[in-house]
Amino acid sequence: MTNIRKTHPLAKIINNSFIDLPAPSNISAWWNFGSLLGVCLILQILTGLFLAMHYTSDTTTAFSSVTHICRDVNYGWIIRYMHANGASMFFICLFLHIGRGLYYGSYMYLETWNIGIILLFTVMATAFMGYVLPWGQMSFWGATVITNLLSAIPYVGTNLVEWIWGGFSVDKATLTRFFAFHFILPFIVSALAAVHLLFLHETGSNNPSGIPSDSDKIPFHPYYTIKDILGTLLLVLTLMVLVLFSPDLLGDPDNYIPANPLSTPPHIKPEWYFLFAYAILRSIPNKLGGVLALVLSILVLAIVPLLHTSKQRSMMFRPLSQCLFWLLVADLLTLTWIGGQPVEHPFIIIGQLASILYFAILLVLMPTISIIENNLLKW
């Protein structure tokens, strides 16, 4: 008799995705982040669901309802901080996952890569709308500033912004619709993640060497299930250390002040995971130009596969490209730092140089250095 997990229509899908899946024998810990992102998503949906049971999306009670969750609901404080810091863990895993893809040439799987970019945009939208919900000062002014960027779109901009706001400013209508979208988007993310996985399983995983590994595959279970469990334990440990010892480390103190449309905070800035894009936005002294640069800072990832000029897939055996990759990492850290600084000298010029370098590395230097490496190897 055949095993039920191989014959049952539903169990068969799970079996082919997580049990009998042929996986390369040499994938490193950098391949753990896909499963960690899945864990983050499940954690966010669960904590978010319990928060939604006690949250009210009305401007008069939103701030109070979050306070109520933290003070009066059983273990409400831990659910709230797990959700807030879970978002940070989500983005840390996202950035490492994308970095892995860039380093090892995983972007050559075009469908998987492009679905990944759509996922990134969706998760960023979800996180932005979630940040608005507590209705603190930074929530309100962050929402005002970021939605206002759409007014830079020629001809339809102003109408578009007022349509999104549901009025002439960020108000009740805005908060209610943001809560609705923030609730539904994670489920859309889940569906997209399933499609992401579907496309990945069409080709199979890449591996650190970038060389096809069809001749050397091992079953996903038990080898990578146990490895993923270890990764999950480390992720949860890190998250809980953050939640239980310094839950407000990554937040903004201004968000503990209830939203006040009549008082602008001295420095409006988004959560840390958006600061790199915010720095690129601010480094261009023109509104429309800044918005375009902001969108392109993420969309540039879609062009990366088209600019792959190397004869090798992975950077494992390409020291010059490795140097450029780590320069890109340092540049992104610089942009993140600049995004949190006031708009004054010397931060303005540093931000502009870092922004230019970011696009230069991805669009010009990487393809050029790859050609040089090909020539050095007489390929």
Curated annotation (Swiss-Prot):
GO terms for biological process: mitochondrial electron transport, ubiquinol to cytochrome c. It is found in: Mitochondrion inner membrane. GO terms for molecular function: metal ion binding; ubiquinol-cytochrome-c reductase activity. GO terms for cellular component: mitochondrial inner membrane; respiratory chain complex III. Binds 2 heme b groups non-covalently. It is a multi-pass membrane protein. Heme b b566 binds at H97, H196. The chain crosses the membrane at residues 33-53, 77-98, 113-133, 178-198, 226-246, 288-308, 320-340, 347-367. Heme b b562 binds at H83, H182. Pfam families: Cytochrom_B_C, Cytochrome_B. It comes from the Eukaryota. Its cofactor is heme b. A ubiquinone binds at H201. Belongs to the cytochrome b family. PANTHER family: CYTOCHROME B. The cytochrome bc1 complex contains 11 subunits: 3 respiratory subunits (MT-CYB, CYC1 and UQCRFS1), 2 core proteins (UQCRC1 and UQCRC2) and 6 low-molecular weight proteins (UQCRH/QCR6, UQCRB/QCR7, UQCRQ/QCR8, UQCR10/QCR9, UQCR11/QCR10 and a cleavage product of UQCRFS1). This cytochrome bc1 complex then forms a dimer. Heme 1 (or BL or b562) is low-potential and absorbs at about 562 nm, and heme 2 (or BH or b566) is high-potential and absorbs at about 566 nm. This is Cytochrome b. It comes from Eira barbara (Tayra). The gene is MT-CYB.
